[in-house]
Amino acid sequence: MGRVAEDGGDIIKMYFAIIDCGTTNSRVYILNGAAEVIYKGTKQIGVKDTAVNGSNEILKTGLKELFENTVREAGLSLKDIKFAITSGMITSEIGLKEIPHLWAPAGIAELAAGITPVQDRTIFPVDVPLLFIRGIKNSYPANATYREIRMVDFMRGEETQLMGLVTLYPELPLPFTAVTFSSHTKYFSINAAKQIVGSLTTISGQLFEAIKERTFVGKSIAGPDGDDEQYDDYFDPAVVEAAYDAVLHAGFLRALMMPRFMEVLLNDPWYIRRLFIDATIIAEDLRVLNDFNLLGFPEDINFVLVGYKQRCRIFKYLLQKYYGIKVVQEIVAKDQVDLLNIRGAVAIAAKAGYLNGKE
């Protein structure tokens, strides 16, 4: 935990909080009336605890402790906090309260209008109003079945991140496609009105973790402990192209096996094998572009990439080489990615009137 910025004294009288509840870790940011972060607290608690335990009581208790400790360490009391705002999986069935998704297209106006305020200690056991930002689901037919499943997708949390993106980077040419890399890869179409038209999601990040932890290929892509930074600095277009070619001609499942052969038979070093597996997954990931037309997403427009540095680099290389699509912005530094969520939450709260006297 630590102080991020100094408070502005008598000029700024009001404080509010942003709760960023992840899968395994959560963060609470305390902001002043000028929307400056003055303190940040973290705790190992997340929605995974609900999934594992079958109850959200541990999550509620952990978030309560984190919230109260962060407020206290910021030199404030709970009565100083006007409200807290949150988004993401905390609004799902394994969070604090399940909040229905908004229909796409939706932008900052729709998200602000859709805020669900709650002050109920059985939901969030702190005596502070909690504002839930709703996720967004694709626009698909009301009578959709599995036959239309390719049109169906949703997000929780990324809508806030994307509003932060268009707020912090107003110069981005509209419309554009944003791609975020985390436990999933998610593609988002942003229209000329800065609305989210919809999303397409793959399980790429979790697939990599499963391969790494649960298959014998994992041994072939593991490097020395603590060498992720060294790997992030390595890039060889020839390796990336070889992986793309393998997926294209031999298929995704066989390409996933190839780092094993590269280790045992070819004696390639671990970082080449790791780059190959990452490029293999991203090559398969790019097949999602085939469904852009189905959802009415523009195909030949600029891309913005957000997330892990190496995945962004591989994706950018393949996107430009094989699809001729330009990447106009990359946001890879963790503090800059975190800032998207903060600025997005602030922008939505401000649009809803919570930063100018709304109770």
Which role fits each region the language model picked out?
Residues 73-152, 192:
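Short beta-strand-loop/turn "lid" adjacent to the catalytic site in phosphate-handling enzymes
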Residues 245-288:
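Adenine-nucleotide phosphate-binding core of ATP-dependent small-molecule kinases
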Residues 25, 297-318:
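Glycine-rich phosphate-binding loops at beta-strand->alpha-helix junctions
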Residues 16-58, 332:
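Short glycine-rich, Thr/Ser-proximal phosphate-binding strand/loop in the N-terminal lobe
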Residues 19-25, 89, 179-184, 204, ...:
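A short acidic Gly-Thr/Ser loop motif
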Residues 280, 317, 331-359:
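Glycine-rich phosphate-binding/hydrolytic loop that grips phosphoryl groups
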Residues 46-55, 137-245:
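Glycine-rich phosphate-binding loop plus the immediately following alpha-helix
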Residues 39-81, 91-92, 98, 337-339:
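N-terminal phosphate-binding loop and adjacent alpha-helix
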